[in-house]
């Protein structure tokens, strides 16, 4: 296992940087187009849009069947494609700080999963992980993303990435799993042992957002009161959809066991990078080693010291110190295979 130190990540970055990070944290950004936003909401949205632009991303939408996808896209379509998948109660904007390192040399696609962000689904939508993976596949096809593609998933997004790679092995060039969800023998947090406890992380009333930050991040950033209230309000509005996702995770845990989950993961042979925050309170760090044992072609896990469940927000520079060389290695190996007579 590789261990890295964040070297005083709390060396308080400038207020603007902290604010940008804060606005990304677990952002759930559904706002009805017919709903009038107040000044704080508009400022909040403007900050997120500026962050996307700073990362080289543009906001787009695409209707595929009964899902109207909201997604960010950046980089040249002639470059290798990366698909980044957000976690529970997250959104595409969770990846912005990572994406700015990627859009120069890669074609980056970051959708809002159904149930998060601005993606629109019917009231009776099936939020099960298998259906999310299938809908994501339909999105990839409709967006004309030429495979195989690199796939990265954080938390719940990791579970979806694993299922996607298992179902579509020839369309998966590599996997990057960040504090990935799943069903594990080494589960040692209340949220893994009994997913019903995930309901405690729902932001359904005032004060819940502060609790969520403390549970998911080792060193939560400062958030100005006005922006905290705006973020909390948006997440409260999103709570019914998040609740449906949690209900599906509870149901999944009753159907699948660590053994059946292992059967899936053992079929995956895509090159895999596993990265974890050592202080993750949601999915304990021991899971990283279990995933390494299950996956055929995984590198030794990278463990980040003084980081919680959100490395892509808490320590994006350390994340990219690992991910960029991994991507280059995969691309180089593939090129050598295609040029070998």
Which residue stretches match the model-derived regions?
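Alpha/beta-hydrolase fold catalytic core
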Residues: 2-18, 23-81, 104-106, 328-341
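Conserved HGGG/HGGXW glycine-rich cap/lid loop of the alpha/beta-hydrolase fold
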Residues: 73-118
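Active-site loop/oxyanion-hole signature of alpha/beta-hydrolase fold enzymes
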Residues: 65, 72, 110-152
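Catalytic active-site module of serine/aspartate enzymes centered on a nucleophile-bearing elbow/loop
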Residues: 298-341
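Short beta-strand/loop motif that positions the catalytic acidic residue
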Residues: 268, 274-276, 280
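Conserved alpha/beta-hydrolase catalytic His-Asp/Glu region
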Residues: 188-192, 203-266
